[in-house]
Amino acid sequence: MVLKEFRQMRRDRRTVALMVGMPLMLLVIFGYAARFDVTDIETAVVGADAATVADALPPIYDVADIDAGADAADGRRMLRDSEVEAVVVADGAPPELLVDGSQLFVAQSALRRVPPGSTPEVLFNPELDTATVMVPSLIGFIMLFVGTVITSLGVVREREQGTLEQLAVMPLRPLDVAVGKIAPYFLVALFDMIIVTAAGLLIFDVPFEGSALLLAAYGLLFLFVVLGFGVAISTLSKSQGEAIQLAIMTLMPQIMLSGMIFPLDSMAAGVRWIGYLLPLTWFIVGMRGIFLKGSSFSALLPPLAILALMAVVVFGFALYRFRQDLAPKQTGDDAGPLDPVEVTA
């Protein structure tokens, strides 16, 4: 009986891949990414004494810019547009340390190592409230879950019940069928985004400093990405069990490596670059910039452009796979009539 079970397990390659791949993935994630203490804080030093003060900063402050002609207002703008994570204002008075509170662990690490004689000030999240930072990220997580898991299960269920094959023989274009199948999940995920956003603003008192138009643009592009994940998974799965397995393998890296839980700055370089390839990473960057900082359009445009590129690639691939699934399969019965065989005496 035991040998029979092992043979059955060996036939299910996706289960074997999940059993072997998931522990290895978790080991890598928690070994190289699960760190809350940030050791390098990208810093700008501004003011007349910028060069002198920069030389005296603790090693944790990675000085990326020294500008003696800039002032505190310029430093605040740099933080608002996510150009740096901390600014030291050295204008002759005791230095002032400005820290980006939207990056919770960066701010906490900076406050534990305040330069001697400096006065710290936390911007965008003065109380270092966890909910203020997490709610914008949770919007992306909920959209990711609904768009990936629920969509993939819904489409696979149609295939298991045979209704997807019925749609394939109806006088509808594959694109019409795809839009009809995806639209309900799009609307559900959009509704969830609105509900979570409203709850964050009303219940958790999360500030909203940016543009509602930019919020809508980020939300729509991210929806196309996650729905593309869901549809692509459904085309690669023969059952709901396989769809759940693939969805888990899609969700886990995005949750762990996007900066939602563990700060990107604390990750090893290779793992951090994996995080940069994940759409949730850029959605979170945009949401924190819109909600907490009121970042300028020019600062939010690069993450938005990356999301747009991902939406085109992922959703385009998903539609291509879905159209292939709907294409009529030629069977032996569909073959043309046999050529007559000449019988000779």
Identify the residue ranges that each predicted region occupies:
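Short helix-capping/hinge motifs at transmembrane helix termini and TM-loop junctions
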Residues: 33-37, 152, 156-157, 200-208, ...
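Extracytoplasmic/periplasmic domains immediately adjacent to an N-terminal transmembrane anchor
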Residues: 1-133, 324-345
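Long, hydrophobic alpha-helical segments
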Residues: 134-153
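Transmembrane helix segments
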Residues: 28-40, 238-281
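Membrane-interfacial helix-loop-helix junctions in multi-pass membrane proteins
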Residues: 73, 124-128, 207, 259-314, ...
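Alpha-helical transmembrane segments and their short interhelical loops
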Residues: 174, 178-248, 252, 297-304, ...
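Transmembrane helix boundary and interhelical loop/hinge segments in multi-pass membrane proteins
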Residues: 9, 148-170
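Transmembrane helix-loop junction
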Residues: 153, 157, 170, 201, ...
